[in-house]
A protein has these predicted regions:
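Well-ordered beta-strand positions in beta-sheet-rich domains
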Residues: 28-29, 103-107, 133-137, 173
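A generic structural motif
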Residues: 64, 93-95, 128
Length: 230
């Protein structure tokens, strides 16, 4: 290796080390040592299931920093509301002495067995594209009226174009009630990316009260929503 190449290599390695050590916060200017990030390990299930009306009880967690216990430095934030069916999150975060932080999240599913407002797993397909086990929530709005977070069953937001939100809204939200035969009575349509591409008058199928399953065809997009169970 010639002298110029050696000098370039030394410069690049030095620059990489500086980026690693100074990329946490501006006050670390001039720091030239390696910093260690906290590691957080969740105990219990993820997702964690709570029945409607039950209190969420923290299953536990541990944290370490360079092999040493760091659990007492973990901060927790949560939006869990066990009085409303849905998918919530508990976020665990910790910051090291250099200002470098790490976080991880536990999903909490609040289930409503036998109810229309519940957490579901979607199976959706159109043509050769087929996606399964996508989490979808139906929330209560008022007496007999519900909001389905995505009439497409996650086909676009989780299946075909994952990671594009929030830049693009691929959740086809609708508010609806059910007719006596279980079919949809669409009351409100959300303003999402492909709204103009679908005919909302062309929805066949619907809800089966005996199985608790939604099975329908939305203008050529087939969706089955099955209540989530462990």
């Amino acid at each position: 290796m010639d002298t110029i190449m050696k000098k370039n290599l030394i410069f690049l390695l030095s620059a990489a080390l500086m980026v690693l050590a100074t990329g946490c916060e501006k006050t670390s200017k001039g720091l030239t040592r390696i910093t260690y990030y906290p590691v957080i390990t969740l105990q219990g299930d993820n997702p964690y299931v709570v029945q409607l009306g039950e209190k969420y009880t923290e299953p536990g967690y541990t944290a370490s920093l360079n092999g040493e216990d760091y659990t007492s430095n973990v901060q927790i934030s949560s939006n869990v509301n066990s009085s409303v069916p849905g998918i919530y999150s508990v976020t665990y975060s910790a910051t090291n002495p250099d200002g470098c932080s790490y976080s991880t999240t536990r999903d909490v599913y609040v289930l409503n067995p036998g109810g229309i407002a519940n957490v579901y797993l979607s199976h959706c397909w159109m043509g050769s594209r087929n996606y399964e086990n996508l989490p979808i929530v139906i929330s209560p709005v008022s007496d007999g009226v519900y909001e389905l977070e995505d009439l497409c069953g996650g086909f676009y937001c989780y299946g075909r174009y994952p990671g594009y939100e929030p830049t693009y809204d691929f959740h086809g939200e609708v508010q609806f009630s059910l007719n006596e035969d279980g079919s949809f009575n669409i009351k409100k349509i959300g303003d999402w990316y492909f709204r103009g591409s679908f005919d909302y008058n062309n929805i066949t199928g619907g809800y089966d009260s005996e199985t608790g399953i939604f099975d329908y065809n939305f203008d050529g997009l087939r969706v089955t929503l099955t209540p989530f169970t462990l």
